[in-house]
Structure formats: structure tokens, C-alpha cells
Amino acid sequence: MIEELRFPLWASPKYDGIRGLVDLRHRLLSRKLKPIPAHVLQKRFSISLFAGIEGELIYGDPVAPDVMQMTTSAVMSVDKDDLASAVKLYVFDCFTEHRLPYWGRYQRLSRLAEKARRAGIILVEQTEIRTIDDLRDYEERIVNRGFEGVMLRDPEAPYKFGRSTLREQYLLKWKRFEDGEAVILGVEEGQRNENEQQLDERGYSKRSKKSEGMVPNGTLGHLIVRDRKNFSGLDQFHIGSGPGLTHELRAELWRDRATLKGQLVKYRFQRIGVK
């Protein structure tokens, strides 16, 4: 893909939240054009000044390990006002100005964001990218800051809802890791290592992983899953790590393990050797 890009492009961090846009009836809607449940957010953003803006609803720090879980809880609940009050809308487009090229729409957003910062409107910063080397350098900086990837835009592009094709290059996603979706087949309990602690040849402490010293710990260890599209080529595999899998969540999932089979779970992987 990278060899097919047409420069210059504008690049911004890929935010991992919930899509939010304000329609012409001044309602805050999701990507599926359904009203956002959080009453606090509807009250704050559902005004005529914001009609047409589109962005990503984010709770707290945009690069926090649990940003997606916390954002979902705050945005998709009707009764979590304290959480919802900490949500901001990171805006990147405006569909009411669809006849303008993207740079023109962005100028309009910039003026709006200056007026509306106290309401929780934040303009997503765009950086001009002129070469492949520029893109690689930018991606490295963004990933090191904790973002999962980069969004690329043609500054001359018209408005389009959703992502465009590689041929159009209006809006493209560029990230090192991809998201997959898998069906949960089963679960495995986590273990606590109670083998005797020893020192290795460098003087560092270590514990062996002898089975007799591995004790069940009452939390989720791994999900046994099968990918819906079989990206891995495996009949089944394990998912057991990730920034959102806190100790508390593992304990909750283990308590509810009887309900997990057949549910869908998202996971992140790096595709290797596939164009």
C-alpha cells in the first residue's frame, strides 16, 4: 500500500474511541447514526453551533491503556454522568461543508474549536506528509506517544462518510497492527508461580515454571478462540494479554466464564508476509 500513496497527504493520530457526530437536528449520533445514550453528552454537544461536526469521543487520556473500555462505559451508559463529564470530542471533519476540500473544512473546524474548547471540543492536529520517509518518521513518533496508528487524508478531498478506497485516498488508515475478531471457544484459568525463587548466572532473580509450583489464581488466564476470517491459519489459538485486561477484569471474566462461550472478542495482531 505505501508505494501507492499520492503525496502530499495530511496525517493525524488514530484515536481509539467512539465515533460521534452532530446531525442537522442537533443530535449527537454514533457511527451507526444512533443517538449516543449518555445524557450529559447529548446536552453538551446537541446545539446548533456544532451541527455537522464529526470526531471521536474519548474519555480522559487518549493513549491510556483502558481508554476504549472507559470511553465505552462513559458514552454508552445513560447513568454515568461523572464519567461522561470527562469525555471530550476530538473533531476532524465537518459534513455541512462537504463542497469544500478538506483543507477548507479543517479551517472551519479550527475556528469552531477555538470558540468551543470549554465545551470539550478539541481539534485533531494535522501534519503535512510529503514523502514515504516523512510518513515512517511520523508514524514512529505517534506510536511512541501511545497511539495505535495514523490516519491519512488528501487535503483536496471532498467529504465522504467513512473510509475511502486506496484509489480515492480521501481517508486511509495506516497502522502497524490490525484488529481481528474471534469467537470464544473456551477459557483457561490463570496461574500463580509459587516455585522457589533463585538467582541466575547474572544475579537476577528467577523462578522455574515447573508444573507442581504453578497454582490456579482464580482469574482468567487465556481465552481459547477461533478467528472468524482465519487470518492466523490456525484452527484455534489463545488470547491472554493486552493493555485492557486488568487484574479486576480478569477476575470478573473468570466469574462469568460460563457465559463467554460463543461471544465475539476483538484482538490485535501484526500481519507478517502478507501484502
Q: What is each PLM-predicted segment?
A:
Residues 2-122:
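Covalent nucleotidyltransferase
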Residues 2-8, 128-144:
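Active-site nucleotide/adenylate-binding loops and adjacent lid/helix of ATP-dependent enzymes
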Residues 18-23, 27-55, 166-275:
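Classical nucleotidyltransferase
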Residues 55-57, 91-96, 125-128, 154-156, ...:
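Short, structured patches in soluble enzyme cores that scaffold and shape functional sites
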Residues 83-84, 143-144, 216-217:
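Extracellular/periplasmic catalytic domains that process cell-envelope and extracellular macromolecules
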Residues 115, 123-128, 132-133, 152-153:
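HHCC-type zinc-binding knuckle of retroelement integrases
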Residues 134-178:
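Anionic-ligand-binding alpha/beta catalytic cores of soluble enzymes and soluble regulatory domains
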